[in-house]
Design a protein with these regions (language model features):
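A short beta-loop-alpha structural element at the N-terminal edge
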Residues: 8-21
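Conserved beta-strand-loop-alpha-helix junction that forms the acyl-donor binding cleft
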Residues: 121-131, 149-153
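Conserved acetyl-CoA-binding loop-helix of GNAT-fold acetyltransferases
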Residues: 91, 97-110, 137
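Conserved GNAT-fold acetyl-CoA-binding loop/helix
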Residues: 22-45
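Conserved GNAT acetyl-CoA-binding A-motif
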Residues: 105, 112-124
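A short helix-loop-beta-strand connector motif used in the catalytic cores of GNAT acetyltransferases and
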Residues: 45-57, 85
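Conserved beta-strand in the GNAT
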Residues: 57, 63-72, 90
């Protein structure tokens, strides 16, 4: 990571970070701006009450510049060890290629290990080949499974 980021914090995100997190996610999904703020706040309140969900973030002078969500899922297979799903991985366009994504995903993987998970999974859009190369570089295997998605209305 570059030395110019001495003010960077890597930590669990809180309600105080929500507005900045929404701004960051608008880079990933422009429809974030159309979402009902009351629904977002209600969802965030639910997330904060659930110790199996954590938003990991890189925060530079109060601005969330990289984030991901990790969800620990109880499981009855694999000797009843849980698994971890990582979703919503994004780094601010102005902060990319500086190791921040690796750090926030690393935080999520540490949470998974602390929780006794037997694996960590994430999905990525089929056309995001740059992201795929990044995930493989940091230890994920894109050739072992095939993800399926069903969008619900």
């Amino acid at each position: 990571m570059e030395d110019g980021y001495k003010s960077m914090e890597f930590r669990k995100l809180t309600g105080a970070d929500l507005e900045s997190l929404i701004d960051l996610y608008a880079q990933l999904d422009a429809d974030m701006r159309k979402a009902d703020p009351d629904k977002i706040k209600a969802a965030w309140n639910e997330i904060e009450r659930d110790d199996k969900i954590v938003y990991c973030g890189a925060v530079d002078n109060g601005k969330v510049v990289a984030a991901c969500c990790a969800v620990i899922v109880p499981n009855i297979t694999s000797f009843a060890r849980p698994l971890c799903l990582i979703e919503n991985v994004v780094t601010d366009e102005q902060y990319r290629n500086r190791g921040l994504g690796k750090e926030v995903i690393g935080m999520a993987v540490r949470k998974a290990k602390e929780s006794g998970c037997y694996k960590v999974m994430l999905q990525s859009g089929i056309k995001r080949t740059g992201a795929h190369a990044f995930y493989e570089k940091i230890g994920f295997d894109g050739a072992t499974k095939k993800a399926f998605d069903m969008r619900l209305k």
